[in-house]
């Protein structure tokens, strides 16, 4: 490497490092810089040119032990991460280094994490439903193959459990590959997920990339791009890939921290002025091409349950389907706590899912909507004051509400109930028969935590 490619650290403020280079070889924006700290090499990424031949960089690892005057080498390329079948079953950090202590790792190919989105000509636009085996999702807010799905919910309503169940179902039922990206979430949850996936064997179809809560903001901001780059490789090889991002809010949050550290004036609610640009650069790369597809499921933490906050609101603009988890449904003991009235999907359309499925979904929504309207009357006057017609609506709605629950495979150890994968045809048939009144005489408790309608009837027999 030529000597004039070497700079010196001139200022360190937490994770922000200013480095002075010769004027004729300033590194490009997004180039990776290596700083030799003796016991380790620290990688930083160029974010700004601030004049006087100084570049401002963000560290991807802890800056502990860093001193002014240390040598910094311009690698002349962005951070590059391993791609290919070798990454399956392994656990990586933002730089593409393995952190699972499972021995030596070698990859044939490396891709830079900053890449252009596919062109219009390359993109595919054929809508097709993606079967998840989770009743409430398949019926009310079906996922599109190659679409972007947002999982919305406050703290502790079950986003991560739902993501784990989806990984499990995709691997077992579709034989599909998944890339799980943990962005700024708890290390303990990542650890639990890793060992659960090892136990169930799902790990061999999955690559995991973690940039957890305790890491510098640079790592949390870039780790989503690392996971996406790995998924893009599989897509370009003709695979249908699932990309899980848990949590996309932490991507925005890390961007906000970095923005403040770089001295940008904040915008609404203290977020970075480049919020929409950063989100767009990530989301536009998640798409289907003529070769394969990336279906992305993104958990979105909603600060203080406020959907108008700029972070979730910006995310909404990019999504094809939303799965909203509701605390009020979780309080009823119904899991997954998906709100059927708040959750939406672009492909809830008879041309994509078929007329029967569409009609049943709309009728289920209608009956639950009516039940919601009647709840105020019930709270004041009691059920007995309702008309016979409304009593029937309430009875069926409560059965529908309970039938939307389902035991999950990944939660077996907590619930003691065997997880269920329900094909979409069975889901549609079950709900159709409930709202037609076929099971008006079956107790509502029989519909709670079962898979198909047959299981509910079996459960009813044991109850009587």
Swiss-Prot record:
Main location: membrane
Keywords linked to the UniProt accession: ATP synthesis, ATP-binding, Cell membrane, CF(1), Hydrogen ion transport, Ion transport, Membrane, Nucleotide-binding, Translocase, Transport
Subcellular localization, as worded in the UniProt entry: Cell membrane
GO molecular function: ATP binding; ATP hydrolysis activity; proton-transporting ATP synthase activity, rotational mechanism
PROSITE patterns xrefs: ATPASE_ALPHA_BETA
Transmembrane stretches, start-end: none
EC number(s) reported in the record: 7.1.2.2
UniProt membrane topology term: Peripheral membrane protein
Reactions accelerated catalytically: ATP + H2O + 4 H(+)(in) = ADP + phosphate + 5 H(+)(out)
Presence of keyword ATP-binding: yes
Top enzyme category: translocase
InterPro entries found in the cross-reference section: AAA+_ATPase, ATP-synt_VA_C, ATP_synth_F1_bsu, ATPase_a/bsu_AS, ATPase_alpha/beta_chains, ATPase_F1/V1/A1_a/bsu_N, ATPase_F1/V1/A1_a/bsu_N_sf, ATPase_F1/V1/A1_a/bsu_nucl-bd
Binding of ATP, residues: 153-160
GO cellular component: plasma membrane; proton-transporting ATP synthase complex
UniProt cross-references to PANTHER family, sorted A to Z: ATP SYNTHASE, ATP SYNTHASE SUBUNIT BETA, MITOCHONDRIAL
Stated role: Produces ATP from ADP in the presence of a proton gradient across the membrane. The catalytic sites are hosted primarily by the beta subunits.
NCBIfam families associated with the record: atpD
Family: Belongs to the ATPase alpha/beta chains family.
Subunit structure: F-type ATPases have 2 components, CF(1) - the catalytic core - and CF(0) - the membrane proton channel. CF(1) has five subunits: alpha(3), beta(3), gamma(1), delta(1), epsilon(1). CF(0) has three main subunits: a(1), b(2) and c(9-12). The alpha and beta chains form an alternating ring which encloses part of the gamma chain. CF(1) is attached to CF(0) by a central stalk formed by the gamma and epsilon chains, while a peripheral stalk is formed by the delta and b chains.
Protein name: ATP synthase subunit beta
Species of the source: Clostridium novyi (strain NT)
Lineage: Bacteria, Bacillati, Bacillota, Clostridia, Eubacteriales
Gene: atpD
